[in-house]
Amino acid sequence: MMIHIHQDKKMSTRSNKKSTKTEKVAKATKPVENVEVSDNEVQEQAVKTKASGKKVTAKSTKQSGGKNAKSGSKSAKSGSKSAKSGSKTSKTQSGGKGDESRDRYFKLIDAKTGRSFGRYTGGTPKQAASKGFTKMIHKIKAEGGALPKNGTMKIYLRESTRGSPRKVYAYEATRKQLTEPQKIEIEGSDGKKKVITYRYRNVIHKVSAPLPNQLGGLKTSRSNKKSGETKKSGSRSSGSKRSAKPTKSAKNAKSTGNKKVSTKSAGAKKAPAAKASR
């Protein structure tokens, strides 16, 4: 009888284990109940999602905006640098020493007396010489004088522009008659247009020969005078320094000469002493 009871206990434990397993499976496979959600809860959830989306977009826009601002500042800096470089180039183009487009002023010089007269403008001394040459010819014709046979004249100009070195320029000018006269319209000081006819053309060449003594000879500018004086003074000072300082070879030659003289004098003194002993 005891054996049957023990077997029944085993069977009961097995059945209990199976029942617990089935309960667990039933719990896991419970059907999902239909949950009723009100409209207010749905709206609240939508508002929350919208707010979170705004925060995310705001953060992203802030980050992108900061980067764009940095890049914008860099571009602004580069723009300012380019503007500075542009201002430098405009300065060099508009004015300065290297600007050849600005007007310069010159005066004609009489080679015999050395007096200057007239005032002629031009970007280069050659242009001013052409204007001065035409003025001289008109003056000679008005006074009834005779033009030179060759038709060539020497013209001397001195620059009178403020800040210039007052350099003197020499040119040879001739006239050539045109086959057909040229007519050019020019607006006068009163605002009316005037027609000027040109029958001659000026041909001007620079003269490389030295200037007359009345005009200062070769000394055509103040800068050349100053440079010549400094060169002369420099050569004199260098010569005096060289003569004052003796070289090492000269010192060595003097010392060897003194040694030879001393040895000769010693030999001369010893010779008579030997003769006396004999």
Swiss-Prot record:
Chain intervals for the UniProt region annotation (Disordered): 1-107, 206-278
Compositional bias of kind Polar residues: 249-260
InterPro entries: MC1_sf
One GO process term, biological-process aspect: DNA protection
Low complexity composition bias: residue spans: 62-94, 264-278
SUPFAM superfamilies referenced in this protein's UniProt entry, alphabetically: Chromosomal protein MC1
Skewed-composition ranges (Basic and acidic residues): 1-11, 97-107
Protein name as catalogued: Uncharacterized protein R252
The organism of origin for this protein: Acanthamoeba polyphaga mimivirus
